[in-house]
Amino acid sequence: MSDEEEVYSDEEVEEEEVEETEEAPAEAEEPEETTEEVVAPPEVKERRAPVQEEKPPAEMTEAEIAMLAAKKRHEEEEAAKLLDYEQRRVLEKEQIEQELRELKEKQEKRRAEREEDERQFAERRRQDDERRRKEEDERKAKADAEKIRKNEEKVRRQQMMAGAFNGRVEAGAGRNFTVASKGDQAAQFGNLAQAKGGKDVMSKEQMEDAKRNFLAAVCRVQDVSGLLPNDLKERIRGLHARIVKLEAEKYDLEKRRERQDYDMKELHERQRQAARNKALKKGLDPEEAASSVHPPKITTASKFDRQTDRRSYGDRRYLFENPEEEKQASLVRGTGRPPAEWGRKQNEELEQIRKNLEPPKYVEQVKVEGARAPVEPVPLFVPTDDFEPQQVTEDPNVGEEVVVE
């Protein structure tokens, strides 16, 4: 036997062993298939090509043996490829399932975290709203208490000041001041001399005495000889609180004075600028108007309510003593009829209307003997001047009456 036949015989032996190992699990799976076939409906089996019976190796030629070996080798390669592909498919499927499982777990975890975050955010928001509401209530209560305390302090200070000047303030005694009427105040302060000599105006010495009395009433000597240590501490705390409050009031008053000074300066500057602009409009010296020590003139009446008379006193006095007499217009004298063109407009349309509207003139057919006019005829006289040289005292329309017999 040659070397090739020995190789082929060894390969055939190996192929037979592999076929036996493959047939063993196939036989083991056959009972399961039979059990499944009992339950499952009958299936149509496909026809397969008839299996050709292999010849024994002794009857095969070398070419057939080589072809058979190549065929078996090809089948083994295909089986190995199929097994490798199935294994890869199983691994890929397991990997995909694992990834899907991990994604679902992550999704569930994120959903739980989001729900937890929303719950915590809602809880924090509720706590913030409640805290803000409490702070607002506390702020309002504190503001109300501070307002009440300030009002009480103001009333107490007013009572203390009134008691320092007037001895003491009785409860329900009414107001401790008097309001002067407007007429009395105007009569008292009509001018500076009366204002200085008024009885209600305090002099400098009186103001100093009032100040000393007030300080003596406020700054009384405290008797601490019979006080216990705790009472002395309370008294010290009270004095310290009062000093702090007085310093705060002093600071507020100083700032208020500064603001008032600033406002006064600003108003004064505005007044100067207004006087300067007014002087420029009138053609006067702006520097003199702005730096004048006299206050600006205040117009008590509107310039639209009356006409401003800019004439001097001498002119007005002369006009008052010699009033201007109205001249009388010139009169046309005579009994003649005035010319037709007086007061008539030359217009063809108007002339045509007049011709149509005027009644026919009366023409005397038979003359009456001895007929005269009711008045003596006076020749027509048209003056050339617009006004009469002398005042006319007689009525020009009144003439001598003529009796008609």
Curated annotation (Swiss-Prot):
GO biological process, alphabetically ordered: axonal fasciculation; embryonic morphogenesis; larval somatic muscle development; muscle contraction; ovulation; regulation of muscle contraction; sarcomere organization
Biased composition (Basic and acidic residues): 43-57, 262-272, 303-319, 342-358
GO molecular function ontology, one term from the record: tropomyosin binding
Region (Disordered): 1-77, 100-156, 262-359, 377-405
PANTHER family in alphabetical order: TROPONIN T
Biased composition (Acidic residues): 1-36
Function: Troponin T is the tropomyosin-binding subunit of troponin, the thin filament regulatory complex which confers calcium-sensitivity to muscle actomyosin ATPase activity.
Name of the protein: Troponin T
Top-level taxonomic group: Eukaryota
Family label: Belongs to the troponin T family.
SUPFAM superfamilies for this protein: Troponin coil-coiled subunits
Any Gene Ontology CC annotation: troponin complex
